[in-house]
């Protein structure tokens, strides 16, 4: 059987780092208040000339180089983002051009913070269906451009950045010891769409709008939804939490991460946390955390890695991958 194996990984962050203390002159807040409630200490903010496309292209180049490939080897460019450069054409097409790729196809996918999980799952389907051999999967965001900088409950939470992986078709044996994606589960429930949304859009207000969130409501649903979809992935493979080498969750809030790991009985030392350095980078969150753990030597070939995310909609999902 065909498996989708991770061949390369890369990331990119804006130059500017904004610390919690930098917010004290903007809104009524403090470093202590932010850290206590979120675990965030700093985040990167896109500056002039830094966009979703430029960050995504930089992460993509790094992933292709890490894979030992050339841009011309890529069949599909799949970008998960909620902050595209333009309403259309797709920012994935712009990244395709930046990389000099003139073959295959490219498109954007939008599932907010769950975007990268949705994108990996979509890429896996294209690979296993024979429509692509190598897929460049990117999560890139510039959420700082849709924040209300007078709302202290949201503006302190988010950062900008990008992460990317190259998935490649490889022959597997249908075993959980195979390298590659072993299971993926996606969910959504539009009944919760008013709990985390942007109050604008081309079809309604003809503006971009700003991010709005009912933080307590999101927190209330997050842990249960996340653990349910993870347990479904375990059931599909016969694996358990004890088999997990690394848990790479969406980096939204350390409280949610800790509560999810505890409910799943995943040891603290197996949890990859970058929310303290990156904040919530939406669709870029999981690949940025993955890239960090690969770069520092934690995640190694053969490790069983659990990925999960939850975002506006609500959307949520989980992926089990053998590195």
Curated annotation (Swiss-Prot):
One of its GO terms (molecular function) is 3-oxoacyl-[acyl-carrier-protein] synthase activity. The active site is at 113, 250, 280. Keywords: Acyltransferase, Cytoplasm, Fatty acid biosynthesis, Fatty acid metabolism, Lipid biosynthesis, Lipid metabolism, Multifunctional enzyme, Transferase. It catalyses: malonyl-[ACP] + acetyl-CoA + H(+) = 3-oxobutanoyl-[ACP] + CO2 + CoA. Its main location: cytoplasm. GO terms for cellular component: cytoplasm. It is found in: Cytoplasm. Its EC number is 2.3.1.180. Transmembrane segments: none annotated. Residues 251-255 are annotated as: ACP-binding. GO terms for biological process: fatty acid biosynthetic process. Belongs to the thiolase-like superfamily. FabH family. The last Arg residue of the ACP-binding site is essential for the weak association between ACP/AcpP and FabH. Homodimer. HAMAP family: FabH. NCBIfam families: fabH, PRK09352.1. This is Beta-ketoacyl-[acyl-carrier-protein] synthase III.
């Amino acid at each position: 059987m065909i498996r989708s194996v991770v061949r390369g990984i890369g990331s990119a962050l804006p130059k500017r780092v904004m610390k919690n203390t930098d917010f004290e002159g903007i809104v009524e807040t403090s470093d202590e208040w932010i850290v206590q409630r979120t675990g965030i200490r700093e985040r990167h903010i896109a500056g002039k000339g830094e966009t979703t496309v430029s960050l995504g292209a930089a992460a993509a180049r790094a992933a292709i180089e890490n894979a030992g490939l050339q841009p011309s080897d890529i069949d599909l460019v799949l970008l998960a983002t909620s902050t595209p450069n333009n309403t259309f054409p797709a920012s994935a097409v712009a990244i395709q051009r930046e990389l000099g790729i003139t073959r295959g196809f490219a498109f954007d996918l939008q599932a907010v913070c769950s975007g990268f999980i949705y994108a990996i799952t979509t890429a896996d389907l294209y690979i296993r269906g024979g429509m692509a051999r190598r897929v460049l999967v990117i999560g890139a965001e510039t959420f700082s451009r849709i924040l209300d900088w007078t709302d202290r409950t949201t503006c302190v939470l988010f950062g900008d950045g990008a992460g990317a992986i190259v998935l490649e078709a490889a022959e597997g044996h249908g075993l959980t010891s195979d390298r590659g994606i072993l299971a993926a589960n996606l969910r959504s429930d539009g009944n919760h769409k008013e709990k985390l949304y942007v109050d604008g859009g081309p079809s309604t207000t003809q503006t971009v709008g700003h991010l709005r969130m009912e933080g307590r409501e999101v927190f209330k649903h997050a842990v249960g939804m996340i653990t349910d979809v993870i347990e479904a992935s375990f059931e599909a493979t016969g694996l358990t939490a004890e088999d997990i080498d690394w848990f790479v969750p969406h980096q939204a809030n350390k409280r949610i991460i800790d509560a999810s790991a505890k409910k799943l009985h995943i040891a603290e030392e197996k949890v990859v946390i970058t929310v303290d350095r990156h904040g919530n980078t939406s669709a870029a969150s999981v690949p940025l955390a993955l890239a960090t753990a690969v770069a520092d030597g934690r995640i190694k070939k053969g490790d069983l890695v659990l990925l999960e995310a939850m975002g506006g909609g609500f959307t949520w999902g989980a992926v089990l991958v053998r590195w």
